[in-house]
């Protein structure tokens, strides 16, 4: 059994909370894409665990965890995150953590060039705005991967004669390319190589052939949960390009990032915030640059885990969700942070876009078009009561249930879970038939 949790909007939907809820039922939790540019917090028995690169299944003592080939890995950050988790009580984490030998390495020079590249991309964009990178070196690493000049984990841990010398040569070539590209790019390559020579031995026990690992698990009928990073609207192909991340964050990235054929995937859970947020620049049709937007931001505590940046806030955009559903094929949805809407008398929901009076059939790929659309809203009545203590779906206010039913009917996918508050246990389960 392979089930997948994916973000359906622009990230920060609350995927970690659903994974936290589900992880006790699984034998393996795997990451398929991204790096340490995403983040979420899981609370277990009052202890907060911050995850960025490592799979959340580490909180389950019976769960193995895999960083897949589609992930790009900054080794110092990997060990720093692991040590923080160990310090908080996950003392056996190393025994249950594995890394694909095919995962690409993020070096410090990738992070250095990230900001330089950001400035160039902002100059090339249609509106002159920054892309909004986290500065973690993710984009430059995927660029070296695509140009077939990157270094993978197996290059680092290979102990065959001459392997380290080959690694060093390729590494220095990558640094030299950046020095030629950016002119005054000063960088201590010797120091980083010395660090990686040390990491080489430390990393070896974690490294596996992830294709063999995953397919052996499937053969043995293990229960596998794939933990998505970022979200569909940040996908390099299907997101609001170029205001996206550098990997495939949708269902396609799950297959390529773990070496899985599509037929082995059973359930795809789409996580949807009850309103919409995004971090950084890029079009955002339902954004509310007004009192409503500020209210959503303040009540929802909309600040990024990884960057601390304020999230832009707006109403739920069902055009985005329907588009996301077409691509990812969600079998059920988790609506999160419904309680943030508790005090709103009326709640507008975006249901269609028009351009110069003409209705668009689907979410547009052209940002020049997207930036000019008018959003048509349906305004639904609020419930104006506190739902944070509610534990049963039937006990939700009628208008809250109508809001959820409107979403289900619009996208044609059942809602299985509803987040009713920030607490770990504040999740209402709704029986669905599939």
Curated annotation (Swiss-Prot):
* Entry's Gene Ontology molecular function annotations: adenylosuccinate synthase activity; GTP binding; magnesium ion binding
Q: Which reaction does it catalyse?
A: IMP + L-aspartate + GTP = N(6)-(1,2-dicarboxyethyl)-AMP + GDP + phosphate + 2 H(+)
Looking up InterPro entries in the UniProt record yields: Adenylosuccin_syn_GTP-bd, Adenylosuccin_syn_Lys_AS, Adenylosuccinate_synth_dom1, Adenylosuccinate_synth_dom2, Adenylosuccinate_synth_dom3, Adenylosuccinate_synthetase, P-loop_NTPase
**Coiled-coil annotated spans:** none
Q: In which pathway does it act?
A: Purine metabolism; AMP biosynthesis via de novo pathway; AMP from IMP: step 1/2
Gene Ontology terms: cellular component:
cytoplasm
Record Pfam families: Adenylsucc_synt
Residues binding IMP are 12-15, 37-40, 134, 148, 230, 245, 309
Set out the biological process GO terms recorded for this chain's protein.
'de novo' AMP biosynthetic process; IMP metabolic process
Cofactor remark: Binds 1 Mg(2+) ion per subunit.
Annotated residues that bind Mg(2+) are located at 12, 39
Q: Where does GTP bind?
A: 11-17, 39-41, 311, 337-339, 419-421
Q: What is its EC number?
A: 6.3.4.4
Quote the subcellular location field of this record.
Answer: Cytoplasm
Question: Which PROSITE patterns does this chain map to?
Answer: ADENYLOSUCCIN_SYN_1, ADENYLOSUCCIN_SYN_2
Report if keyword Zinc is assigned: no
Q: Which residues form the active site?
A: 12, 40
Tell me the residue numbers annotated for binding substrate. Answer: 305-311
Record keywords: Cytoplasm, GTP-binding, Ligase, Magnesium, Metal-binding, Nucleotide-binding, Purine biosynthesis
How does this polypeptide assemble, per the annotation? Homodimer.
What the protein does comes down to:
Plays an important role in the de novo pathway and in the salvage pathway of purine nucleotide biosynthesis. Catalyzes the first committed step in the biosynthesis of AMP from IMP.
> In which family does this protein belong, per the annotation?
Belongs to the adenylosuccinate synthetase family.
Instruction: Tell me which NCBIfam families the record gives.
Output: PRK01117.1, purA
Q: What name goes with this protein? A: Adenylosuccinate synthetase
- State the organism of origin: Lachancea thermotolerans (strain ATCC 56472 / CBS 6340 / NRRL Y-8284) (Yeast)
According to the entry, what is the taxonomic lineage of the organism? Eukaryota, Fungi, Dikarya, Ascomycota, Saccharomycotina
């Amino acid at each position: 059994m392979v089930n997948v949790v994916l973000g359906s909007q622009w990230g920060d939907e609350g995927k970690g909370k659903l994974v936290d809820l589900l992880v006790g039922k699984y034998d393996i939790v795997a990451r398929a894409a991204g790096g340490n540019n995403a983040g979420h917090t899981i609370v277990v028995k009052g202890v907060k665990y911050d995850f960025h690169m490592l799979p959340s299944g580490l909180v389950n003592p019976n769960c193995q965890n895999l960083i897949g080939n589609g992930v790009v890995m900054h080794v110092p950050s990997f060990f720093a995150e692991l040590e923080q988790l160990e310090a908080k009580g996950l003392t056996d984490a190393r025994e249950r953590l594995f890394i694909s030998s095919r995962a690409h390495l993020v070096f410090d020079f990738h992070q250095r060039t990230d900001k330089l590249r950001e400035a160039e991309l902002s100059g090339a964009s249609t509106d002159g705005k920054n892309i909004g990178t986290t500065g973690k070196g993710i984009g430059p690493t995927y660029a070296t991967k695509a140009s077939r000049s990157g270094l993978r984990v197996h290059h680092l841990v290979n102990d065959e004669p001459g392997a380290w010398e080959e690694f060093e040569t390729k590494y220095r070539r990558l640094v030299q390319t950046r020095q030629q590209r950016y002119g005054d790019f000063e960088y201590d390559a010797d120091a980083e190589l010395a660090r990686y020579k040390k990491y080489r031995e430390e990393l070896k026990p974690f490294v596996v052939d992830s294709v063999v690992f995953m397919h052996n698990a499937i053969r043995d009928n293990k229960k596998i949960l794939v933990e998505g990073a970022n979200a569909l609207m940040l996908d390099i192909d299907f997101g609001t390009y170029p205001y996206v991340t550098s990997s495939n964050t949708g269902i396609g990235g799950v297959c390529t990032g773990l070496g899985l054929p599509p037929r082995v995937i059973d359930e795809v859970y789409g996580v949807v915030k009850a309103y919409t947020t995004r971090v950084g620049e890029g079009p955002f049709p339902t954004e509310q640059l007004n009192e409503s937007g500020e209210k959503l931001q303040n009540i929802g505590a909309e600040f990024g885990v990884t960057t601390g940046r304020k999230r832009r806030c707006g109403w739920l955009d069902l055009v985005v969700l329907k588009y996301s559903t077409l691509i990812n094929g969600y079998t059920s949805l988790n609506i999160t942070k419904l309680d943030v809407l508790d005090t709103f008398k009326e709640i507008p929901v975006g249901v269609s876009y028009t351009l110069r009076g003409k209705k668009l059939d689907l979410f547009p790929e052209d940002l020049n078009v997207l930036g000019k659309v008018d959003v048509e809203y349906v305004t639904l009545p609020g419930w104006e009561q506190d739902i944070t203590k509610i534990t049963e779906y039937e006990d939700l206010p009628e208008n809250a249930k109508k809001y959820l039913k409107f979403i289900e009917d619009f996208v044609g996918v059942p809602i299985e879970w509803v987040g009713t508050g920030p607490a770990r246990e504040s999740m209402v389960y709704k029986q669905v038939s599939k």
